[in-house]
């Protein structure tokens, strides 16, 4: 496990702290950022966004949130590789490092959602077209943020918070969508509502319960053999969006499990990225 500051990882112009001072509510971990051997982050003292700029920008930006059950952030498998792949397609990519609920923040289970809203606002302050792409728990977080742009999860900090955190589209890859029974075994469920939540708490953190006709166009991809986030999560979100009149496309992958990122070349899990690229190119 490595420990280092974000200043040593990125040039200052490439990393933007989310908050002007300490994050809402205060508290949080101390010490340096922790990076595991596979590139997963934890001990998130200073949440922010890392920008990847392509050689020939197409005028569209994608905010990426990697997963990790709200216990860590899978930068090495999902964040950075996906950002560089999007760069190859002309998209400016922003990779979000968000606060983790179990790291002693005073605002508890709200902190990642606060960071998601703030990140969308921050990217909107720099870009005209903002698309969201979330994986696993990161998909839960961005999917929920896309559904609740008018919800004030924190008190305004500065002028950036006057921007409505709306997205132009949402891509959710093997996402956690619902925390309601029988889908209660995930780390996302444990991190956000614990072992013995009320039905109201589980419903409050379930993305599908906030979908309206105003939800952005949605792309979903998940493997049928995903034993971490039940594939029914994507089915529930797909069907909810269809009923609400939201444009939605879902890719069902025959094999791949969970957490495959871009997918290994030559495997069924490697099909989603090009399908997403075609879909995203059609979003105006």
Language-model segments: which ranges?
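Catalytic nucleophile-loop/oxyanion-hole region of alpha/beta-hydrolase
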Residues: 74-81, 96-129, 266-271
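Acidic catalytic loop of the alpha/beta-hydrolase fold
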Residues: 179, 225-229
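Primarily recognizes the serine-hydrolase "nucleophile elbow" in alpha/beta-hydrolase
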Residues: 114-185, 202
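C-terminal catalytic histidine-bearing segment of alpha/beta-hydrolase fold enzymes
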Residues: 231-284
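N-terminal cap/lid segment of alpha/beta-hydrolase-fold proteins
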Residues: 9-57
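Short beta-strand/loop motif that positions the catalytic acidic residue
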Residues: 214, 219-222, 226
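Mobile cap/lid helix-loop segments that gate and shape the active-site cleft of serine hydrolases
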Residues: 33-37, 175-210, 216
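Short beta-strand element of the alpha/beta-hydrolase
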Residues: 59-68
């Amino acid at each position: 496990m490595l420990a280092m500051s974000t200043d040593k990882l990125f040039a200052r112009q490439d990393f933007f702290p989310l908050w002007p001072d300490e994050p809402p509510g205060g508290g949080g971990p101390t010490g340096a950022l922790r990076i595991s051997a596979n590139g997963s982050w934890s001990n998130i003292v200073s949440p922010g966004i890392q920008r990847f700029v392509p050689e020939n920008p197409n005028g569209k930006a994608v905010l990426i949130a990697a997963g990790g059950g709200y216990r860590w952030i899978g930068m090495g498998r999902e964040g950075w590789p996906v950002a560089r792949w999007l760069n190859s397609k002309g998209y400016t990519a922003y990779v979000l490092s968000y606060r983790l609920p179990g790291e002693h923040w005073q605002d508890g289970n709200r902190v990642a959602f606060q960071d998601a809203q703030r990140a969308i606002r921050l990217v909107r302050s720099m870009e005209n077209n903002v698309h969201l792409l979330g994986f696993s728990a990161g998909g839960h977080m961005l999917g929920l943020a896309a559904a609740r742009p008018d919800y004030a999860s924190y008190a305004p900090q500065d002028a950036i918070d006057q921007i409505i955190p709306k997205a132009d589209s949402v891509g959710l890859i093997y996402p956690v969508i619902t925390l309601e029974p029988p889908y209660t075994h995930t780390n996302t469920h444990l991190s956000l509502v614990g072992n013995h939540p009320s039905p109201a708490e589980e419903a409050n953190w379930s993305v599908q319960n906030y979908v309206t006709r105003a939800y952005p166009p949605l792309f979903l991809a998940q493997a049928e053999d995903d034993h971490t986030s039940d594939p029914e999560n994507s089915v529930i979100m797909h069907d909810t969006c269809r009923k609400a009149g939201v444009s939605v496309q879902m890719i069902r992958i025959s094999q791949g499990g969970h957490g495959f990122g871009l997918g290994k070349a030559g495997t069924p899990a490697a099909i989603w990225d090009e399908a997403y690229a075609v879909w995203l190119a059609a979003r105006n």
